Amino acid sequence: MAPKAVQGNGPGFTKEEKAAMRAAARERKVRSGAQDAEREVLEKIAGMDPPDRRMAERVHALLRSEAPQLAPRTWYGMPAYANAEGEVVCFFRDARKFKTRYATLGFSDAAKLDDGKMWPTDFALLELTSAEEARIVELVRRATR
């Protein structure tokens, strides 16, 4: 028996999740050069709300200087940074993306953050001070070792 279509407010994907999936499908169709990919990341950052935009700009600058081996690209419509194999290592999700109260710096399974049998992969960001920036640099260095 075929599953019934989900209607109304029942279980299923949110409007924001569907938009992210459409963005990912577009990204797979249009794999452009490195300059175009970075331009697309910068356009995504420019479209963010001011507090998240400032943090995303700073995260982008940190990653470009501290992890130049990571290539900027978009991933599900978010700024992301991929290794030489094209695997996303980390990404920046603005608060508006999924209507959360904080932005997120997230790491994928390609990041080498393993620490025992359990470790964090997403970090909430409300503000970036020098302490958070130092933590980000340390995490990215671990993730790319």
Where are these regions (language model features)?
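Charge-dense, helix-prone N-terminal extensions
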Residues: 1-145
